[in-house]
Each structure stands twice: as structure tokens, then as C-alpha cells.
Swiss-Prot record:
It comes from the Bacteria. HAMAP family: UPF0210. Homodimer. It comes from Halothermothrix orenii (strain H 168 / OCM 544 / DSM 9562). SUPFAM superfamilies: PFL-like glycyl radical enzymes. This is UPF0210 protein Hore_14430. InterPro entries: UPF0210. Belongs to the UPF0210 family.
Length: 452
């Protein structure tokens, strides 16, 4: 039973510690929109998105006002467009991306995800068309996000896809060079991608999902940091217990919003994603939580252990607070979106190699990392290969969202604005991986993938 102290504590978390609901994401199946005529398929897509999501933003605002819990983003995730558009005879899928963008603008959401393909074992014709369309699709749209799954623990790593995505990322940066390569901030390459992720840029509506669903992503690094301030100097047992209790309260807020949105929109509730999602705002940082545990600067020795503790404790506390947990559900470490991470990079305590180590124990992977515009496509592909290998071997989701910023070099900065923040350009190894990436083929699945 709730007591008055807990109610006041939750109010304080919202007012002073930047607790919010990061996103309400509506997943919509577009499988029945496929048609041999691209024009008909696009009309079907547009009409269906408006039919289901027409009231999403209004309902989210009503809940926000009624309960006093800020809901930062309203988003849509759709069936991977490579599946929906494949039956059309069109040579590229750019117009499909523009249709998604138009529909998203009409209903008023911040982003729409699902310009996606699943190619962990190989490419279909539709997959190839979609991947080749990504650079111009992201350059021509404002709200569309793209994701490609190149590996799974059960299938291994499709190195042909890894190689191709390095080139696509470079081309996307060139196509959006007037905005600092912004298109790459809306493009993510996955291993073991979840089908119910509410966060961008990796959200899409999986083929095992219902016709329509509501998924919610929480936030609240500031609330966790504030709680840890009260146990300064105490043992890690106490630290873990404190994070668990705070995560429970944060997730309860997410569960409340998800259930209420589901009821008002007459759409099934899917999952709450337990990921601690930072913002560029001061005091809303995952890096600062790690430093509160006793690290001088994020990236110092001990950072990976601190992050492992945080990630595990958030899951334990959050799982108790929601009937259905899913998505990515862990701590995010996006460099440009976390004020503490940005400071750590500038201080020199955090580099690409340390971030890769940290991704072994947390959610997602190398996220929102800016590198010099001169970085070769093969090097980007090799970074992707390293990161997805961590996911495949450890049976977890990993991903890469990397921005080779045109015209920028190590030490420069690029400003993306809003939740995407500011990215310091980080150093990448100058040694070549071209011969390695040039081999192609597939890296086989690990032996422990054979579970049956």
C-alpha cells in the first residue's frame, strides 16, 4: 500500500530529478498494406497509420496533464518496410519512406521507425532495395528512422550485410552533410534486435506482434543518481538495493501510463522497456550515476563493473513493477545524448575501446558516436562486426549508431540538437581492416546457440 511519503517522493522525482516517460510508441502492423502497385501500397500505409494513430498524441497529452508525468516523445513503429514494399515492382523504396514521414507529420508524432530489414542470414530482393534506399530516404525525411539486423545468436553474423552497412552509413553521412551527417543518427545496425523496442532509431513492429500495440519506454537517470547520493560511501549491496527500489518506482510510473494509454486508445498493452535513457540535460546522465558510485570520471577503471551493477539492479527492480517487460531494457550509453559521457570524452577518460567494453554489460551498444568524416567504410564495418560479435556470443542485443561527420576531425564537435545532443568527434584506429571485411560470407553461430 502506498504511503504519503512515497507519493511525495514520486512527485519530487518528477519535479526535481527529471523523471519522465521517454516515449509512448504505438506499433502498427502494415502487413495487410502490401500490394503489387507501390502507389496503392503507400495509400494503404498512409490510411492505416492515420486510422490507428490519429489520436495518439492527443491521448498522450491528456495523460500527461492528468497525471503530471512528462511524456517526452510520441512515436510509431511499423512492420519492416522491406517486407511490406517487397511485393511492389518499384526499384527503390524512397517513396515509402516519404509516405511514412508524411503520415507521422499528419498525426504529430516525433519519430516513426520501421524503415527496416532483417538480413542476419541473407538478403531478399526487398531487403537489398530497402538498404540501397536508406541514404536518400533519411535525407529526404525528418521523422523516419531506419534499422538493419545483421546478426543473431542462432544465425551468426552476415558479414556481407556488415560490409554493405559500412558503405551505407558513409553514403548517408554524405547525403546529410549539410546537417552534420544527421541521417546517421537515425540509422542503427543491430544484432539480436528485439521486435517490441519502443526506442528510436531501432523501433519496428515485429512479425510476431499483434495488429496494434502500445509500448512504453521509461527514463529517470536523475532519480537514480539522487537516490545514490543518500547512500554515499556505503557497500555495493546497499547501492544495488537502492537502485532496485528506485527502478521499481520509475517503472510503476511507466506501467501506469502504458495501461492508461492502452485503455483510452483501445489498443493492447505490450511492454514497458526498462532502459535508463539519458538526455543532454545536466543531471539526467547515466555517466553521472557511475561517477556517483565513486569513479572520478566515466571510463576510469571500474566503469564496466559499475555499469554491470546498474544494469542488473534496474532490471531486478523494474521487473517487479510491470506485468510485461521487454524491448531493450537496460542502461543506455549514447555519447551525444548524455552530458556526463560528453564530458568524459573531452577529459580523455572515455574512448571507443572502453565504450565497446561497456557494451558487454549494458543495453544496446556503441550509440551516437561521432567519428572523423575521413573514416573508411571498411573501418566502420569492422566496428560494427566487433559490436555485433559481442551480442552474438553473449546472446544479447547490441547495436551501432555511428556518425562519420563530414568535414570534422578528432576534437571537433557536431551539434544535432534536441534529444540527440552534441557529439565530440572521437578517434578511431588508423589501422586497416579492409582485407578482413573483404572476405564476405557468414561468421557461423556459436556452439552454445544449439539449445534444443
Amino acid at each position: 500500500m502506498l504511503n504519503p511519503y512515497e507519493i511525495m517522493e514520486t512527485i519530487r522525482m518528477i519535479e526535481e530529478e527529471k523523471l519522465d516517460i521517454r516515449t509512448i510508441t504505438m506499433g502498427i502492423s502494415l502487413r495487410d498494406c502490401a500490394h503489387p502497385s507501390g502507389e496503392v501500397a503507400r495509400k494503404n500505409i498512409y490510411d492505416k497509420i492515420l486510422r490507428y494513430a490519429g489520436n495518439l498524441v492527443e491521448v498522450a497529452r491528456d495523460i500527461e496533464l492528468e497525471y503530471g508525468i512528462p511524456i517526452i516523445n510520441k512515436r510509431i513503429a511499423v512492420t519492416p518496410i522491406s517486407l511490406v514494399a517487397e511485393s511492389s515492382s518499384e526499384e527503390d523504396f524512397i517513396k515509402f519512406a516519404e509516405t511514412l514521414d508524411k503520415a507521422a507529420g499528419e498525426v504529430g508524432v516525433d519519430f516513426i521507425g520501421g524503415f527496416s530489414a532483417l538480413v542476419h542470414k541473407g538478403f531478399t530482393t526487398g531487403d537489398k532495395k530497402l538498404i540501397n534506399s536508406i541514404p536518400r530516404a533519411l535525407a529526404n525525411t525528418e521523422r523516419v528512422c531506419s534499422s538493419i539486423n545483421v546478426a543473431t545468436t542462432r544465425a551468426g553474423i552476415n558479414m556481407e550485410a556488415v560490409s554493405r552497412m559500412g558503405k551505407i552509413i558513409k553514403k548517408t553521412a554524405r547525403e546529410t552533410r549539410d546537417k552534420g551527417g544527421l541521417g546517421c543518427a537515425k540509422l542503427v545496425v543491430f544484432a539480436n534486435v528485439p521486435e517490441d523496442n519502443p526506442f528510436m532509431a531501432g523501433a519496428f513492429h515485429g512479425i510476431g506482434e499483434p495488429e496494434c500495440v502500445i509500448n512504453v519506454g521509461i527514463s529517470g537517470p536523475g532519480a537514480v543518481k539522487a537516490a545514490l547520493k543518500k547512500v554515499k560511501g556505503q557497500k555495493f549491496d546497499t547501492v544495488a538495493e537502492t537502485i532496485k527500489k528506485t527502478a521499481f518506482k520509475i517503472t510503476r510510473a511507466g506501467q501506469l501510463v502504458a495501461r492508461e494509454a492502452s485503455k483510452r486508445l483501445n489498443v493492447p498493452f505490450g511492454i514497458v522497456d526498462l532502459s535508463l535513457a539519458p538526455t543532454p540535460a545536466v543531471g539526467d546522465s547515466v555517466a553521472e550515476i557511475l561517477e556517483e558510485m565513486g569513479l572520478e570520471s566515466c571510463g576510469a577503471p571500474g566503469t564496466t563493473a559499475a555499469l554491470a551493477l546498474l544494469n542488473d539492479a534496474v532490471k531486478k527492480g523494474g521487473t517487479m513493477a510491470s506485468s510485461h517487460v521487454g524491448g531493450l531494457s537496460g542502461a543506455f550509453i549514447p555519447v551525444s545524448e548524455d552530458a556526463g559521457m560528453i564530458k568524459a570524452v573531452k577529459r580523455g577518460s572515455l574512448n571507443l575501446e572502453k565504450l565497446e567494453a561497456m557494451t558487454c554489460v549494458c543495453s544496446v551498444g556503441l550509440d551516437m558516436i561521432a567519428v572523423p568524416g575521413s573514416t573508411k567504410a571498411d573501418t566502420i564495418s569492422a566496428v560494427i562486426a566487433d559490436e555485433v560479435a559481442i551480442g552474438v556470443i553473449n546472446n544479447k542485443t547490441t547495436a551501432v549508431r555511428i556518425i562519420p561527420v563530414p568535414g570534422k576531425d578528432v576534437g571537433d564537435e557536431v551539434e544535432f540538437g534536441g534529444l540527440l545532443g552534441t557529439a565530440p568527434v572521437m578517434d578511431v584506429s588508423k589501422f586497416s581492416s579492409s582485407a578482413f571485411i573483404g572476405r564476405g560470407g557468414r561468421i557461423p553461430a556459436p556452439i552454445h546457440s544449439l539449445k534444443n
